[in-house]
Regions:
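Outer-membrane beta-barrel domain signature
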Residues: 27, 46-50, 75-77, 111-113, ...
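Short, glycine-/polar-rich solvent-exposed loops and beta-turns at beta-strand/coil boundaries
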Residues: 3-4, 52-55, 115-118
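Periplasmic plug
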Residues: 1-44
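Short loop/turn motifs that connect adjacent beta-strands in outer-membrane beta-barrel proteins
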Residues: 6, 66-71, 95-96, 131-132
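Transmembrane beta-barrel wall of Gram-negative outer-membrane proteins
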Residues: 78-107, 112-149, 166-170
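A beta-strand signature from Gram-negative outer-membrane beta-barrel systems
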Residues: 31-75
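Solvent-exposed coil/turn segments that connect beta secondary-structure elements
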Residues: 1-3, 15-17, 45-47, 64-66, ...
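Flexible, solvent-exposed coil segments and beta strand-coil junctions
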Residues: 63-71, 99-107, 153-170
Length: 170
């Protein structure tokens, strides 16, 4: 929404649990590691099944589990401005019990002065499957320190676009 505190009109569910924040229906996307997402479904239009303020539709995020995503994976990458990124995931199952863990780490110095950022994310899921049903227990943990926005007067911009007028911009 262009106005802080105004509902987005989009309900977001992670494994069937609503993820929108109470104030303004915003979503803390930094809680969900990319390596933990199995699929996403967009359900357009208003539907009372998805609760209040679902005027623009619903987004359903499905996370991985040890039954559908066994094995491990590690991904490392680098980029401009000293960007470093690491992702790992590991899942498996034995009998009716399944497990899946995933973590993402991102750090960069930023494109402007004093704009370094870091994100740490963890996801864990225990699953139980039987002929009569299934149960999942999930844990999400994240810490983010994203910096980079900030106004810059035109006179300072002409000197160097990498400057920042005020800091810290927390």
């Amino acid at each position: 929404s262009p106005l802080l505190g105004t509902p987005q009109g989009l309900s977001v569910y992670v494994d069937g649990v609503r993820a929108n924040e109470p104030f303004g229906d915003t979503v803390n996307w930094d809680l969900i590691p990319h390596s933990a997402i199995a699929s996403m479904d967009l359900i357009p239009g208003s539907n009372p099944l998805f609760g209040l303020n679902t005027l623009g539709g619903a987004l359903s995020v499905h996370t991985k589990d040890g039954f559908s995503h066994p094995g491990g994976q590690v991904e490392l990458s680098t980029g401009s401005f000293q960007r470093r990124n690491a992702e790992f995931s590991y899942g498996g199952h034995k009998g009716s019990l399944g497990w899946f863990v995933s973590g993402d780490w991102f750090k960069e110095d930023g494109w402007r002065d004093y704009s370094n950022s870091e994100v740490k994310q963890f996801f864990g899921k225990l699953s139980h499957r039987s002929a009569t049903g299934e149960a999942d227990l999930s844990l999400l943990r994240a810490r983010s320190d994203l910096i980079g926005n900030g106004l810059l007067p035109e006179s300072m911009y002409k000197q160097s676009r990498n400057q920042i007028f005020t800091r810290p911009d927390a």
